[in-house]
């Protein structure tokens, strides 16, 4: 993968490195797996956040460029800029998601994923559909070279066809060597060009139409070769 972007909104800093960004992504996704494996029914959301921070610290990822978030149950409906309701305990049949943004050396990581416990089929479908929608949007980006605004309109329509509502309060954002916010603070959903690979985080947050729960998935926009088919939902990813 080569660095070819010339759009001013897609500038990077002096420490940007393709290999570095991919390594930060790899370490961030491993941390997601490590944290999710330690979350069990009966755990308080605040305790899960503290545990997640400790896992990141133990993994050499003690610096983060946005708060470490764990959302349980009804808190999965909330936009990231809204604080969780306190005192939420993970139930035996429940849904939760993680949103972490560690820095590895000079490079920003960012990943989010939804998990379920128990056997609630609706929760399981929501978690699966968030990831599937990500890959459908990513696939149409790669095939049709849509703008950021067009990608989120496609995501909105597709989410509704799945029976969910897309939360556009999570509209995607830049990523690069730290700090990307010093370069560009605009949203992917407002970007009027086709996004370049390794410049943007595509955020997908879908909500139950009745507002009871939601699911979240995010990753860098990258070409299909960067994704393992064995970990993809049933979606067209080429």
Predicted regions and their residues:
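Active-site neighborhoods and metal-handling regions in enzymes and metal-associated proteins
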Residues: 1-238
